[in-house]
Regions:
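Non-transmembrane "mature" sequence context
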Residues: 1-153
Length: 153
């Protein structure tokens, strides 16, 4: 008797990883349990300045993007750590910037300009202003994907 393997069963192939070029200089893992643990514990405050510097934006811009008031930012600096929600928003901001870098072929200045510019595909909002919620962040990821594929927005 012959055993047939179903042709509809496919071998698992892991999805594309987020490139390391932005994560490594920041000292953050791009995925996996280390990243999950860091977010749950709260990112150390030192990552805030690294992220702002790497994204070529001022601290106030990053603070506003992740919905942290100046008063709360000073509290986080004293505590030395962000909470889970703020950490998640910071990591989402890095991931969006990574995709913008890919869109602009690693031109950091162009990606930073795009992140700071009003965009028709986002209802004339800036991508940096769309980091408050997962839905808004997903809209930015979706827009980058459409632009990469040449879909008019």
């Amino acid at each position: 008797m012959e055993v047939k393997v179903l042709s509809s069963i496919k071998e698992y192939q892991p999805g594309p990883q987020i490139p390391q070029r932005i994560w490594m200089p920041l000292g953050l893992p791009s995925r996996g349990t280390r990243l999950h643990d860091l977010i749950c514990e709260g990112l150390p405050f030192e990552f805030f300045d690294r992220i702002a510097s790497h994204l070529h934006v001022q601290r106030e811009v990053v603070s506003k993007a992740i919905c942290v008031s100046p008063t709360m930012l000073s509290r986080r600096a004293k505590a030395g750590r962000f909470n889970t929600v703020e950490s998640d928003r910071l990591v989402a901001l890095v991931a969006v910037f990574e995709n913008a870098l890919y869109l602009f072929e690693n031109d950091v200045a162009a990606a930073a300009r795009w992140m700071n510019s009003s965009n028709r595909g986002l209802g004339w909002n800036r991508p940096l202003d769309m980091m408050r919620t997962r839905v808004e962040t997903k809209a930015v990821f979706d827009l980058i994907g459409r632009l990469e594929r040449g879909v008019l927005v």
